[in-house]
Amino acid sequence: MIFVLGIDAATWRVIRPNMGRLATFRRLCKIGRCRELVLKEKPISPSVWCGMFSGKTPEEHGHESFAVGGSLVKRQDMKVEFIWDILDREGKKVRVLNVPFIVPPYSFRVDFRPVGFGLPTNEKEWHEELERVTEKTRELLTESPDLLISTYTLLDRIQHFHWGEDYVLEWYRRVDDKIGQLLFDTGFLEEKQNKLIIISDHGFCSFGEAKVQTLPLKSEWGELKGDHHENALLIVANLDYEIERPQDIFFALKNLK
């Protein structure tokens, strides 16, 4: 089984200085390979997630925004095949949960309604997403699919509006705990044939440091404190394929038997 766990906006800038308080990340870095994945493309979420699971560059897939001409982009508007389409056609058992290359985030062969239409913007919704995505992912793990892809989105919004605050670490600790439940409490990583990829679509930094502004400085949710950085997170375990760019996730999954 291959499990790809996406953590939108996860960054080593928060994790590395706080390894003593993030037991799951600390444990993963002892048993797997942990490093930064430096994006050569713009750290724009819909584009990066799309390329990650289609194998296409931004120039090839042309998907840069959640909305075009005032309308939300839908899966059927996109002229690419994703890894789950290919593997499903080949007869593989594939489950995909909450991947945010569109709004609301996309699921495949899974019945799931994203929290807050996929844009959780307050503490209640962040708690709800964390609980519901964890619960559903754990349920899907018991089905033993050939490929499971699942994504948490909450850290992106939290960091946009709370970057530099202790509040951000509080949420990393909550996410760290849930990842531990998925990977260690279930025994997933005890099975050596199981392969794991944990990846973010970008890192994070202060608003002034960001090379790309992804949200207005002021919004109904508050003033932006942080924004996307090109240094994404990557953790792999039991995987030999070298990942140097987001698109390599597609090829790693396509080449694994």
What are these regions (language model features)?
Residues M1-K257:
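Feature captures the catalytic ectodomains and active-site-proximal regions of enzymes
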